[in-house]
Amino acid sequence: MNRANIAGIGYSVPDRIVKNSELEKYMDTSDEWIQSRSGIKERRWVEPGTGTSDLAIDASRKAIQMADIDPKTIDLIIVGSLTSDYFFPGVSAQVQDALGINSIGAFDVKAAC
């Protein structure tokens, strides 16, 4: 019987940190208002030209390295995100192409917190 497992974990976050105080310049809000309602103090923003697929590909490569596996042993790619680079193709297809494993299944799950 085949069993699924998570052999490695990877993540990728943008370098740019945007604090609540920076948002005060663009909208009628305050650090206190945001923190009291969401608990959020800062967030990461990508630079122009960087897409969800760039972060997903970087995270995938880190997970593959951690797992110490050949990407060709992967059977399925699932990407969970509410943001995509394009309406079509999905981010999973871009990850699949970047990893060079085009003969397997890949799909996106639209999800947010």
Go through each PLM region and give its residues.
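Active-site nucleophile and cofactor-binding loops and adjacent substrate-binding regions
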Residues: 48, 106-113
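Short Gly/Thr/Asp-enriched flexible loops that form oxyanion-binding sites at enzyme active sites
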Residues: 83, 87-97
